[in-house]
Amino acid sequence: MMRKIRGRHVRMSGVLLMTVMSACFLTGCVDQHPEGTQTTIQPTETLDSMLQITDPIEKEAVEIAKAKVHSMGAEPRIIATSPAVAEICDRLELDLVGICSSSSSVPERYEEITQVGAAMSPDMEIVSGLSPDWILSPSSLQSDLQPKYETIDTDWAFLNLRSVQGMYRSIQELGEIFDREEQAETQIKEFKDFYEAYQKEQEGKTHPRVMILMGLPGSYIIATENSYVGSLVALAGGENVYEGSTEEFLTVNTEDMKNKEPDII
């Protein structure tokens, strides 16, 4: 997560929902090699290390933000500019003064609050008129939204929704900043309990080579392990056939995909 503090930019880690790892292998999959090239799952990282926040600059940023919110003496006025961010706020029992317009359902507690426009292009006149203390947005839109936020008197944070680990780190951070540690810990524990049980069920089992193909109008892209869905596959025990890329998504030709010989698409 990245936020502005006293005119400087400070790096923080990213952010939510309970993930059903087995869905990666049970929904919308095509098994290409039912008796093929699968290998045994080997745990590579503990839950605690995955969710631990170790960056000292990041920790400092959280402490500064926490102190600033505490000094207000009142609940901060917060705007959430995407459905996912709004869901996070709901889980943390945070009140909002503004929320993005969306065709999807929003948490019941936010049904009557002011809508500020689409996630990709919020109406800054409405945003500014709500006099927010904080604006929370996904980091994928940072390059478009940050210049707009800098024109109004507010703090802002871009939440990294690119991985499950990042989501839960951000839940921890937001819980600390906005005095919602108990709610944040509830979400973390729910995830840990689920994932530890899932890992025990998968001990000694083989894991497939997976290709994550995402359809777009007129084309398609490949999701790598750096994308949110890619992190789900990794946590579920799958091996992404396009591991090693620094990008979230790739455009590749069909011949290259065929040569990867995935077990599951």
Please state what every model-predicted region is.
Residues 102-106, 221-249:
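Alpha-helical, coiled-coil/dimerization segments enriched in small aliphatic residues
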